[in-house]
Curated annotation (Swiss-Prot):
This is Endo-1,4-beta-xylanase 1. Its EC number is 3.2.1.8. Pathway: Glycan degradation; xylan degradation. InterPro entries: ConA-like_dom_sf, GH11/12, GH11_AS_1, GH11_AS_2, GH11_dom, Glyco_hydro_11. It comes from the Eukaryota. GO terms for molecular function: endo-1,4-beta-xylanase activity.
Length: 227
């Protein structure tokens, strides 16, 4: 999934991104980013959790914030999208999550976030569809946490959209050997393992449990929490 987005460049244009669909509700009560074939790009707070949503506008995809920490995504013949709920800023917290994830084609379920200085987009892949993102990235090593083996990879995106506009930046990947949809993810263990393999992080921006899809169909219904 070489072109499987690297973005959420809408971070600098949140107010305009949400203006039309949210005219009828307060920003902190944005339960329905819906009623269109493609949910408009947005980020903000909902029921005490940070959410972020981005798509390239292709196909049909609907993101909905539900009660508490729960969200839902349904997509059909989509382009590229990524979105989910979590926290801002990201930390080494232990994340509990669960729910349902059923991609028909390319898709990821991951703890997903960004840092600045250095600018890094990171993924802890818990499950994926037909494409393993490690297949086109540089293998760095393996470590064990949260009941399974994770393989570590790094890749570089050149002149691609990011939280700071069009930039060149690295992507860090931890990919779980045995896919799952539910469990605990100790993010500090991943951060430590990346550091040990020469993959430093910077100042954290958001950190969400995200659903991502690319030229596929499917649905997910995910909740998140911490210990």
């Amino acid at each position: 999934m070489v072109s499987l987005k690297s973005v959420l460049a809408a971070a600098t244009a949140v107010s305009s991104a949400i203006a039309a669909p949210f005219d009828f509700v307060p920003r902190d009560n944005s339960t329905a980013l819906q009623a269109r074939q493609v949910t408009p790009n947005a980020e903000g707070w909902h029921n005490g959790y940070f959410y972020s949503w981005w798509s390239d506008g292709g196909g049909q995809v609907q993101y909905t914030n539900l009660e508490g920490s729960r969200y839902q995504v349904r997509w059909r013949n989509t382009g590229n999208f990524v979105g989910g709920k979590g926290w801002n800023p990201g930390t080494g917290r232990t994340i509990n999550y669960g729910g349902y994830f059923n991609p028909q084609g390319n898709g990821y379920l991951a703890v997903y976030g960004w840092t600045r200085n250095p600018l890094v987009e990171y993924y802890v892949i818990e499950s994926y569809g037909t494409y393993n993102p490690g297949s086109q990235a540089q293998y760095k090593g393996t470590f064990y946490t949260d009941g399974d083996q994770y393989d570590i990879f790094v890749s570089t995106r050149y002149n691609q959209p990011s939280i700071d506009g069009t930039r060149t930046f690295q992507q860090y990947w931890s990919i779980r050997k045995n896919k799952r949809v539910g469990g605990s993810v100790n993010m500090q263990n991943h951060f430590n393992a990346w550091q040990q393999h020469g993959m430093p992080l910077g100042q954290h921006y958001y950190q969400v449990v995200a659903t991502e899809g690319y030229q596929s169909s499917g649905e997910s219904d995910i909740y998140v929490q911490t210990h």
